């Protein structure tokens, strides 16, 4: 599994270790992630949880503007994690090499940006217009995810970039006030059925659990066993440890 290590330029991330405020802090964080087993960097500057302040796209971009070219000098892929096409376009022009589209590619403008820059696109499932407006998924979650991807990939084909799409079942996002026990069972159901998402013939990308509880550890190992192509991770060393224990090749 290729791992994208998380660097957060948003000050209200739940994972405080990932927060950076200067290019120097961003480089230190990125180098640590790469040393611990990450292959690439995922950079975001707008929190997606309900506790994060929603800022204007100009503020989001200002937070990461100086970071993108610095991280690009590391010689690894850098993904820009955003739901704003204005931010995506600027980050890709500044050296980012992957679009991690936190709007689920539901905006036409995001497809325009992706097509213009010719980059791989992570397409996450969302039950809302963006991560801040999620609703509960009714019925079979995998059926809902498949239906969502069918619609997004039809648009991708229209823009001629279907083959560059990477599919994310969206388990890193959640509606506000979702009880953990319910979310745990939802994620376990989705992770147990990742093979059903391979019907599209495209790589899979999972936002990997980072909290240290028995249930989070169980979910992390479940994902690693499914061997998706990509993972978004705060602690790459945990993933590599599980891979070694299970005898799963790294890379």
What annotation goes with each model-predicted range?
Residues 1-3:
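Extreme N-terminal starter segment of soluble prokaryotic enzymes
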Residues 5, 13-28, 50-66, 85, ...:
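Active-site-adjacent loop and "lid" segments of alpha/beta metabolic enzymes
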Residues 28-44, 230:
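Catalytic domains of carbohydrate-active enzymes, especially glycoside hydrolases
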Residues 34-35, 73, 92-93, 110-121, ...:
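Acidic (Asp/Glu)-rich catalytic clusters
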Residues 40, 98, 163-164, 230:
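Residues at the N-termini of beta-strands
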Residues 71-76, 158-161, 199-201, 250:
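Short helix-capping segments at alpha-helix termini
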Residues 78-80:
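Conserved hydrophobic beta-strand within the GNAT/NAT acetyltransferase core sheet
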